[in-house]
Amino acid sequence: MELLDRLEEVFGQRPLAEVNLPGGSIGEVHLIKMADGEQLVAKLGGRAEGGLLVEAAMLRYLAGHSQLPVPAVIYAEDTLLILEFLPGRSEFSPAAEADAARHLAALHTITAPRFGFDSDTLIGAFSQPNPWSEDWIPFFAEQRLLYMGRLCLEAERLPASYLRRLEAFCDQLDRWLLAPAAPALVHGDIWATNVLAQGDQISAFLDPALYYGHAEVELAYIALFGTFAEPFFRRYQEIRPLPPGFFETRRDVYNLYPLLVHVRHFGGSYLNGVDRTLARFGF
């Protein structure tokens, strides 16, 4: 069924038009224009089975538990997700980066008794397991690094020798990582196209990969992909100072996870990043 026909079924009126939007590397994304002038965003398929329902649940969770600006969920089913349209561009002035730091620092003050989440979530197209766990370092080792490493091996994206190196590294993670004072709610996928700004203000955070973990995983991810630069980190540390050693050591440990996610998605040069990181720590 054509998208406009499907939307007519949902709304009881036919939209005036739909336009493809960028950012649909996993599924299709469309801007929908309704007869009354309202604009909506429709997302189609592309994620893991039930993935759009998981995305809807994550956005609703953020809306109900935080002040993070996220699009309202208008309609959700397995193959169709309709969201509020929030204007903005993935271009950030220094003031907008500082505003992003304020938002994320506030998000990271939201805590839970344990690490994980009420359900598994998503990172890109893949399920992200979140069994409730008492201890951060074993959770990060098993549910992030080893889980994704095994997915990469099964997909023939990661040599078996790399997984053995990763397993040996995970046995010694407590040499480099620190447990947080409390599990913090993290967005989990802060790269540039998942954040929108209007002028000097952040207008939306999109496509979360939620769980309660260590806030440093969020900051490491931002540094890896260059989502934000010095104005962001300066303002974040004014609000929530980081213990020594994050930029020197822990950042690279945490970034093994997004590197492995990208190996699973794309292979290629991301495997070199995994190799360099493991070698840096002697594995």
Region locations from a protein language model:
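ATP-binding pocket architecture of kinase catalytic cores
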Residues: 19-138, 283
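Conserved N-terminal boundary motif of the eukaryotic protein kinase catalytic domain
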Residues: 12-19
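Hydrophobic packing residues in well-ordered alpha-helices of helical domains and bundles
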Residues: 52, 97-100, 162, 166, ...
